[in-house]
Amino acid sequence: MKIPQRTRGYLAIVIAAVLFGVWPSLSKRVLTEVHPFVVALLIQLVPAIALSPSLRRLRIARSDWPLLALSGVVGAVAAPIVYFYGLERTTASNSVLLSNSEALFTILFAYAFLGERATPREYLALGGIAVGAFLVTTQLRFGDVQFLGFLIGNLMLVGAAVCWGTSNTASAVLLRRIPIFPLLEVQLIFGTVSFAVLVPLSGAPLAVPSDILPDLLLLAASAVGMFSVLFFYAFRTIGAMRTGAILPTSALWGILAAFYFFPNETLSVVQVVGGALMVGSLVVFYLFRGPTETRAAGETLKPEASDGPDSP
């Protein structure tokens, strides 16, 4: 039995949300031993090498280069710098919470610039996902979140989310004309080349401790490479707004990843309720999904999200 394309899109973003949830805890572990610039270089270099064959016979229209450069510089250079330095200046719980703001900006930008809309019932389910993510990440223990004590780091994480939301919007437009693998490869090249210059200029040591190397490779392969492919595939099949709406479920997986890396922690009742609300809302969001709306003829910002190709 063939799985419908839109269903594959929802499955792709659900899996991507799991990988996205692992990102903060895994990054926090790696940053304890490796300089942020070196982390940003290596986690983009590894998938860039793996995807390099996709550049064969690639042709990019001259009119697409400004948008492609914007997505590469903002998403693969500026965002990692701000994110990793912000991550060093805040707590793990704050990073899980604030990582979800990328989904918020992706939804807002899809609404404002891509002309995407959802049905009233989808908006209701979206609200349920947001509330569930809020419960999972905060546990309603606001004294532990320490926003004021880590204000600079928190603001940097939000700034990184704005950068990635901007890059996501540009990518959603470019995916209408450029296949997933080549687009991702060009963006990774932007990041790899930029950090290859920044690392020696900063004087950061390239040496990676052997006990951290597996975490770094896992971060590169899963949280960057696999996540980006699945994320872009969801863009093409269900649209940027619905992709961004489901991404906050990463908070649940982020908490579970934190328990794996820090086994002394336990789930609270509030987190169990929040996780159930997120999963239930996700099911409702899928069951009551509506068709992706398109703009009037002549308006080209909205990608043909529901009619993308079957393969990257």
Predicted regions and their residues:
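Hydrophobic/aromatic residues within transmembrane alpha-helices
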Residues: 30, 39, 86, 112-114, ...
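Specific transmembrane alpha-helical segments of multi-pass solute transporters/efflux pumps
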Residues: 19-26, 55-99, 133-135, 220-238
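Glycine-/small-residue-enriched transmembrane alpha-helix faces in small-molecule transporters
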Residues: 1-38, 43, 144-173, 256, ...
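Hydrophobic transmembrane alpha-helices of multi-pass small-molecule transport proteins
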Residues: 46, 51, 69, 109, ...
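Juxtamembrane helix-entry segments on the extracytoplasmic side of multipass membrane proteins
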Residues: 5-9, 33-37, 41, 60-66, ...
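Transmembrane alpha-helices of multi-pass small-molecule transport proteins
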Residues: 32-78, 105, 163-167, 184-203, ...
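Helix-helix packing/entry segments at the starts of transmembrane helices
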Residues: 39-42, 80, 95-101, 170-192, ...
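Cytoplasmic-side transmembrane-helix entry/capping segments in multi-pass membrane proteins
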Residues: 13, 64-73, 118-130, 178-187, ...
